[in-house]
Amino acid sequence: MTHVEIRHAMDPVSARQLDTAGLREAFHMGDLFRSGEIRLVYTHYDRMIVGGAVPAGEPLVLDEVKPTGTASILDRREMGVVNVGAAGTVSAGGESWEMGRGDVLYLPMGAGPVTFAGEGRFYILSAPAHTAHPARLVKLEDAKKVKLGSPETANERTINQFIHPEVMQSCQLVVGYTQFHGGSVWNTMPAHVHDRRMEAYLYFDLAEEARVFHFMGEPSETRHLVMRNEEAVVSPPWSIHCGCGTGSYTFVWAMAGDNVDYRDVEMVAMEDLR
């Protein structure tokens, strides 16, 4: 069973007027991981699709997604899959990949229907593509690692880059996840924006009672969303995107847009945040 929700894009002036319920309706993506289902959110931010697949012992096939206007989802798209659960298998284009927890798979345009099997909890990211690059499974030890932050600022972390120009080719998808060092809870702080790319976050590895306070909005008009385990949020190009957890967590970041330059950002000075 595949469920698809559509999210239209919103400008910053309209977003300023929203209350908590309105912000969550526009940007928060919960309930992506439902047993025995594929659940997708088709966003109008660079046409990024965000979703989850939980086979729970019965294979799930992702094929036609009506909002894409194509017979199969990968006819004119590429896909990244991150396994945030137990071991599972993903099959497409006549190949199969065994995915452990934390593995990331890239599937190119034209790979055909995608089958998810096993006990995995598969986080799905897809964006339009113009050509087919080779499919590739990337494990944590093969990702590019960037260490940032410090214990003194509670933001010491390792950024693991998987679908990234220095690791492999893609059309516009850039995907990785960030792991925190002991005692650090702040992500993407100091904050930044990147007007040429949207971004989506998935927060996971949270304890049941833990929460992440995700900050968004224009630097001069910040808002927050309270996030639980395995919940996602879409970040428009005009918005900051950072957060602070009540305990340890990991988050997947994914971008699509005009370029694949992870460093192409506009930093926001602390004194400019409101």
From Swiss-Prot:
EC assignment: 5.3.1.17
Cofactor note: Binds 1 zinc ion per subunit.
Role this protein plays: Catalyzes the isomerization of 5-dehydro-4-deoxy-D-glucuronate to 3-deoxy-D-glycero-2,5-hexodiulosonate.
Reaction catalysis annotation: 5-dehydro-4-deoxy-D-glucuronate = 3-deoxy-D-glycero-2,5-hexodiulosonate
Organism: Cereibacter sphaeroides (strain ATCC 17023 / DSM 158 / JCM 6121 / CCUG 31486 / LMG 2827 / NBRC 12203 / NCIMB 8253 / ATH 2.4.1.)
Family: Belongs to the KduI family.
InterPro entries named in the record: KduI, KduI/IolB_isomerase, KduI_N, RmlC-like_jellyroll, RmlC_Cupin_sf
Pfam families on file: KduI
GO aspect biological process, one term: D-galacturonate catabolic process
HAMAP family tied to this protein: KduI
Gene that encodes it: kduI
Pathway: Glycan metabolism; pectin degradation; 2-dehydro-3-deoxy-D-gluconate from pectin: step 4/5
Keyword Metal-binding: yes
The name this protein goes by in its record: 4-deoxy-L-threo-5-hexosulose-uronate ketol-isomerase
